[in-house]
Every structure is written in structure tokens, then in C-alpha cells.
Amino acid sequence: MMMEYGGYFSSSAVAQQSGDVPTTAPSAVTNSFFYTPQSHNIYHQYATPYLQSGRALTTAHNTSSSSAGNSTSSSSSSSNYRNTTHDSLQAFFNTGLQYQLYQKSQLIGSDTIQRTSSNVLNGLPRSSLVGALCSTGGAPLNPAERRKQRRIRTTFTSGQLKELERSFCETHYPDIYTREEIAMRIDLTEARVQVWFQNRRAKYRKQEKIRRVKDEEEDPLKKEPGQISLEEIIDQI
């Protein structure tokens, strides 16, 4: 019994001196009491899976590191490509495209403005002061062309003229409501009816003046001195 305890303590001392290294060779404890071929087989049984798992972890770590390096390099290269492409596009947009668009828009705008201004000035009547000063040149219009440019006269039918004459006998100065009513009855615009009444009043004044002259020639004593007739008052208005 004493020899067994002595072998145990001697093996413990050897294990402490080796620094508790897990990979101690079996030869370091060959003289130990507990070293047997069975314990050596058990050591290899447990050590081999751990070593294999360690190698597998190391290989996986190296593979992941290499893949991470490849992905980092690919991402950096793609980012560099994107940055280069973005810089190229930005330089293109900042130099060529804006210049071309500005030049084209400037040319189109100036041509359009010039054509529009010339058309507006050419559309002005030459008889007016603005048309005479701003005309772009060319020979003045002859009377035939001026007649063509005049407004087309309205041709009244017999029924329209009868209705207008009847309304004129009722009043020489119809208001806008009366003119609109007349225009609706004879299928004309209110502006045409107003122009007709203006022309009819002018014609009526001329007829009344001619009639007065004839009356004075036939009977000069009929009119007393200083007397003003109603027709003269209307003519003065």
C-alpha cells in the first residue's frame, strides 16, 4: 500500500513540473504507476477529434478571411468603378450637355422672339403711327389691298331691315337691353345692331337737313328769326 501511494505522488510531481501541458508525451510518465496502454489509447481517442475540429476551425477561419478579403476587394473595386462613373457623368453634365442645351435654347428663343416681334409689327396697320414707325419695310399697301383688309360689311335681309326701321321709328337711341332684344329677334349680334343705329341716325340727320333746306327755299317767311327747330338741336348733339 505504501508503494502505491508513493507512485501516485511521484506521478503528480512530474505532472506539476511539466506545467500541466495537455500535449505531454506518454514517455514523460512511462515510469508512472498510472500509465498503461489503455490510457494511451484513450488519450489518442480524445485528442484526435479535438485536433481535427481545431484544424477545421482554422481552415474555416482562413477561408472566411480569404472570402472576406475577396468581397472587400470586389466591393472596393465596384465602389471605385461607381465613383469613377459618377465623376465622369457629373463632368459630362457640368460641361457638354448644359452648354449644348443652353446654346440650343438661346438660339431657338432668339429666333422665336424675332419672328414673333416681326409678325406683330407686320400685323399693325400702316396708317397708324405705331405701324408707320415700327413697320419692317416694304412698299405701302395700295388702295385695292386696303379695301381687301377692310371689315366685311354685313348684308341685311329685307325682314331684318323692316324690323330695324320699325324699331328706329320707336326710338332713335335704344339702350343696350333694347338692342339685345332686337338682335335676338332678327338673329344678329348686339354690336351689329348698334352700328346700324349709328349709321341710321347719321342718315336721318342728312335727310332732315336736306328737307329743311327745301322748306326754307319754298317758304322763307315760315321760319321766324331766332327760332331753333328740334332738328337743329339734334344735329348739334
Swiss-Prot record:
Phenotype of null mutants: ALA and SIA axons exhibit outgrowth abnormalities, failing to run along the lateral cord to the tail. ALA axons are shortened further in a vab-8 mutant background. Drastically reduced expression of let-23/EGFR and plc-3/PLCgamma in ALA neurons. RNAi-mediated knockdown causes severe defects in the ALA neuron in young adults.
Function: Probable transcription factor involved in postembryonic differentiation of the ALA neuron, and regulation of genes that contribute to behavioral quiescence, a sleep-like behavior mediated by ALA. Regulates its own expression and also that of homeodomain ceh-14, together forming an autoregulatory loop in the ALA neuron. Involved in fasciculation-independent longitudinal axonal navigation in many neurons.
Keyword Lipid metabolism attributed: no
Predominant localisation class: nucleus
UniProt superkingdom: Eukaryota
UniProt keyword annotations, A-Z: DNA-binding, Homeobox, Neurogenesis, Nucleus, Transcription, Transcription regulation
GO molecular function: DNA-binding transcription activator activity, RNA polymerase II-specific; DNA-binding transcription factor activity; DNA-binding transcription factor activity, RNA polymerase II-specific; RNA polymerase II transcription regulatory region sequence-specific DNA binding
Regions recorded as binding DNA: 149-208
Bias (Low complexity) ranges: 62-82
InterPro entries per record: Distal-less_N, HD, Homeobox_CS, Homeodomain-like_sf, Paired_Homeobox_TFs
Gene Ontology biological process terms, A to Z: axon guidance; neuron development; positive regulation of transcription by RNA polymerase II; regulation of axon extension; regulation of transcription by RNA polymerase II
Name of the protein in question: Homeobox protein ceh-17
Family: Belongs to the paired homeobox family.
